[in-house]
Amino acid sequence: MKIIYQEQPNECGICVLGMLANELHEDKYAHDELLEQINLPASGLSFFELETYGKKFGLEIASYQLTLEELKQLEGKYFIVHFPKHFVVVHKKQDNLWEVFDPAKGKYLLNDEELKKQWTGYAATVQKSFKEIPPINKRNFFKHFFDLNLIIFYVFIELIIIGISTLLATASKTMIANTVDFGTSVNIVVFVVFFLVLKGLYLLLYALLQMVRNVLFWKQYRGYLGWIMQTLQTKSFVYFSNKSPNQLTERQFYLKEVLSFFNVHIPNLIISCTVALIIGTLIGINQMEFLWIAIVQIVVNCAIFLYDFFFTKRITKQAIPQMELQNKVSLQLDGNLRDEQNGKRFNYLMMQLRKALIKNQNISNQKEVNHLASDGVKSFAQQVFDFLILALGIIGIIEQRYTLAFLFYIFSIQALFSAYATRIIQFGAAVNLYQFCKDKLVTLFEDKVNDCNFKVSWKCPKVINLNNCSITLNQNLDLANLNLNLTNGMVISGENGSGKSTLLKILTGRGLSYQGQIKLDELDLKDFSASQLFHNVYYLTGQLTAYNDITDFGYSEALLNCKNPQVYQLLADTGIHNQIKLSSGQKQILQLFLLQNLKDKVILLDETLNAIATELKPRVYQLLIKPLTYNNFVLMVEHDLRFVNSEQDLINLSPYLQQT
């Protein structure tokens, strides 16, 4: 670990954080940079502040008061130890020997007794974690993702590869020139052996360098991906309500393309401009006709590349809506199979899915055929130019304008020139893709919090009033003129399709439209923000096909908070605690059990007892549903009316149905 020396007595804490960040994250913080990161108090940092600021540097710090023996038993490589008015980092080197990294004195060793004399008894463990994410926008995007040191390293790797290629060309020229008088057979054998050895070394070194480059790239990619995904933990409800899961998973593609632009395309541009200038000059000095061939080859390669790029861009624009349609229909089909039994709708959705699949397959086939055709044309053009160079070279040898050695040399560097010059044109396409991915990443970072500007504060209602409410169920059926006073514990019934579930869903405030007024006590439902309703209104359906295992529900945590032994007995009698896979009835019991610690919420239960055995329903109601009414507002949709205590606790929606 490299020491960062403090310049003032109060800087030991920040220096310790910088040393650990440099060691665990391979950062390169210097003293002055650390002071820019934190507004350092005059008294220095405390353990609490070390824990807080440590997250900024990607450090998970936990402090303890403990003995030396307990310190020895802690897991970890490095520990922060508190001396009187001073912090140091220690590392257990041997059983009775500690290596100390002191921002005031440097590195030194202490045995147990020496450490014990200076130590105050307070220490902290240090673990590597993801760094906190600062706000990212278009103005500071470049700063967050551009790493000059990595770009310099990648340019250095490219220079090594080019140097090897140039050395190979020069060596070939030298070998042919020095063996041309030994006879044709000897000349060929020497050249082939020497060429294969050099080519083998080149390929081996090229593979190693590319491996190093790929390892560094994917290490950086994984770090940034974890760094970005950590932001999801701090995002608001509004953020997730406005972002689809597909948008969140797209981050990986956008991130990879952005990092490729900085770490691949920018170094390639720097190298390509340099190589094109130097080698183009060399070719022009030696023979202009080869330079013109190279220029024509570059133009042809660029034309093929641009055709492929714009074709792919156009076909991708066609593919996006088809893919979105395919995903949308797949979700609808999944809902049909899980929540409905509607053969006509199933057949319609399958027809739509088949159409989308066929169109997507046709688009994929077009892209594949186009890529194959482009590669074929490019390969053919390369062969044509190779034969043209060879023909000009043979003519030049016959006319004694240059030697065989020069032909091999010019052949090698001309190929290098055309390859790198073509990359300059390809950089334009990379810029186009970078701009697109950058904008997408910035958009995904944005978190609009205007939803939090709600008009009223949440309070659990005692009554929900519906005044002249009308709800459209489908094109032929409405719930009209609903004037209802819904009270805690009330059960809603009615024939199938009478709008029971729709009414509960409207009370969630999640976008279903209605006419009229719905009031929670004296407050209008529309006055609450979507975030407030999401956190305070619970809607549970009996259709729980997505969950199979008790670990999906956080079962262990809920058990710790359960105080009623009869509930324990219910869980044991229904076999929930020892089941690997849960039945539908067990899932319903479990989801009701997990609600037990809720307070001041509106809980909407949509047929959450329909899969439970008939003999168990009264017991489940008494132990899991009725207690919810003590601290919450509960509404139930049920066909089984044995739980209704009086007519005042029952609402039948069937009389409100109207044909339209």
Swiss-Prot record:
The chain crosses the membrane at residues 150-170, 188-208, 265-285, 290-310, 379-399, 402-422. Keywords: ATP-binding, Cell membrane, Hydrolase, Membrane, Nucleotide-binding, Protease, Thiol protease, Transmembrane, Transmembrane helix, Transport. Residues 6-126 form the Peptidase C39 domain. Pfam families: ABC_tran, Peptidase_C39. Gene3D superfamilies: Cysteine proteinases, P-loop containing nucleotide triphosphate hydrolases. Belongs to the ABC transporter superfamily. PROSITE patterns: ABC_TRANSPORTER_2, PEPTIDASE_C39. The active site is at C12. GO terms for molecular function: ATP binding; ATP hydrolysis activity; ATPase-coupled transmembrane transporter activity; cysteine-type peptidase activity. It is a multi-pass membrane protein. SUPFAM superfamilies: ABC transporter transmembrane region, P-loop containing nucleoside triphosphate hydrolases. It is found in: Cell membrane. Residues 464-660 form the ABC transporter domain. ATP binds at G494, E495, N496, G497, S498, G499, K500, S501. GO terms for biological process: proteolysis. InterPro entries: ABC1_TM_sf, ABC_transporter-like_ATP-bd, ECF_ABC_transporter_ATP-bd, P-loop_NTPase, Peptidase_C39. The keyword Iron-sulfur does not apply. This is Putative ABC transporter ATP-binding MG390 homolog.
